[in-house]
């Protein structure tokens, strides 16, 4: 009987350990802590995929808005229509900025992402001031909008340089 009793106790110990381990893992997930099974290289790849996707989305929004400005310049839209169009594009920039803020960003890419978000914010503000210029005709607003757009490009290029430098470093290590 004692061997059956020992087997029964051993079985219950194993079940108890499995239950406790499962509860521990469940508590970690409930508390919002993540158990990372990915490697730093996987995290870098995920960030780069997200970053390049963000850049593509941004380019699409910027190109579409620039096309609308072209139509306005040709007289296809009046000023009020262009103001409305600009107002419809501003939330798209907000969405891009929010999207970037939700990235799981490795530390080595954080400064580059911050610069890119700064670029998006400057481009958004430029479009906002351009809208105000259309409404008021104030050349100062147009000049400030142009300066902000120039800054947005500068921040974007700096961001790309930082990402490319980190990416090149990863290629030489890996």
PLM region descriptions:
Residues 1-10:
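N-terminal Lys/Arg-rich, disordered targeting/topogenic segments
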Residues 9, 38-41, 120:
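Intrinsic low-complexity/disordered segments
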Residues 12-31:
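Hydrophobic membrane-insertion alpha-helices, especially the h-region
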Residues 30-49:
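Ser/Thr/Pro/Gly-rich low-complexity linker/stalk segments immediately outside membranes or between
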Residues 46-174:
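Alpha-helical segments in soluble extracytoplasmic regions
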